[in-house]
Structure formats: C-alpha cells, structure tokens
Design a protein with these regions (language model features):
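Active-site/ligand-binding surface loops and adjacent short beta/alpha elements
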Residues: 26-100
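A generic short-segment signal for beta-strand/edge and adjacent turn/coil regions
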Residues: 15-16, 48, 60-63, 103-112
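Beta-strand-rich recognition/accessory modules
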Residues: 90-141
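Acidic, contiguous internal or C-terminal segments within carbohydrate-active enzymes
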Residues: 1-34
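Solvent-exposed residues in well-ordered beta-strands and their adjoining turns
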Residues: 18-22, 50, 140
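Hydrophobic residues positioned within well-ordered beta-strands of beta-sheet architectures
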Residues: 13-15, 45, 137-139
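Solvent-exposed loop and beta-edge segments used for protein-protein assembly and interaction
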Residues: 7-11, 39, 131-135
Length: 141
C-alpha cells in the first residue's frame, strides 16, 4: 500500500513487476492488436471494474475523455463509476511510471459493455525483451 488517508477517503497501491528473460532468444510481448485485431491492444497492467461501473466516465491527460482515449498515450487515466444501490461513486486513478518502457503507455479502456483499463506497453507494437535483460514495470493505482 503506497498511501492511506482515511480523512481524505483515499488509498493508493504501488505495483511493481520484474521479469528477466532467461532464455537464449528474445521474449516477445504482443497483444491481439499486434496480431491484426483493431482496438484490442490490452496487455500489461489490466483492471476490470465492477458491473456497476459500466458506462462510467473516462478521463486522461491533455483533456482526453470518453471511449476516444482507447489507443491514446497518457501518463495517467482516471475511471469514475457508481456503486450499486448507494448512489455513491468512486474514482480509480492509474499512473504509469516514467521509468516504464514506452512511457507514457497507450491505454486500452472501455466503459461499455463493462469497465476496464489496461496500461499497455505493447498496445499495437511488439516489445522484445532480449536474453538476460530484465523488464521492470511500476504503477500506482
């Protein structure tokens, strides 16, 4: 847990992933989009929201918003959704680290038919991790 603020009503979670290629050939990362399926560039960090978040609001840097954020680069993405039966909402904020490969990432994001967001360094272009190299990915949500 990165930070907890009960008075402010928020908390954050820091996520770090490390993968070392121990093979004697490159390890290739791709997505369905790199195989020819349009707007299917999910991979890397992936979040699927609760059913009640369907139809939520999508926001990103530079004034980007809505489903048009799909495939766009941004150092952050916010998803605002409502909770069943309460009338209350929450905002989930995803931050891509400047130390990550291909920062800022391209986002795979939907609000219909369900809420999801993916910070994808291989959205529409394969990434090769060479033998002996380590891939380090850091995020905050």
């Amino acid at each position: 847990v990165g930070e907890v603020d009960p008075a402010g009503g928020f908390w954050s979670l820091d996520l770090s992933f490390r993968l070392k290629n121990v093979r004697n050939r490159p390890l290739i990362f791709g997505s369905p989009a790199t195989e020819g399926r349009p707007a299917a560039g999910y991979g890397g960090l992936f979040w699927r929201g609760p059913r009640s978040f369907g139809g939520g609001e999508i926001l990103a840097a530079e004034g980007l918003e809505g489903p048009e954020v799909m495939g766009q680069t941004s150092p952050w993405l916010a998803y605002v959704g409502l909770h069943d039966g309460t009338g209350r909402g929450s905002t989930v904020l995803f931050l891509d680290s400047p130390t990550n490969v291909r920062f800022p990432c391209k986002w795979f994001v939907r609000n219909d038919p369900y809420a999801c967001a993916s910070c994808s360094f291989m959205f529409d272009e394969e990434y090769a991790l060479e033998p002996g190299e380590e891939l380090a990915l850091d995020y905050r949500a």
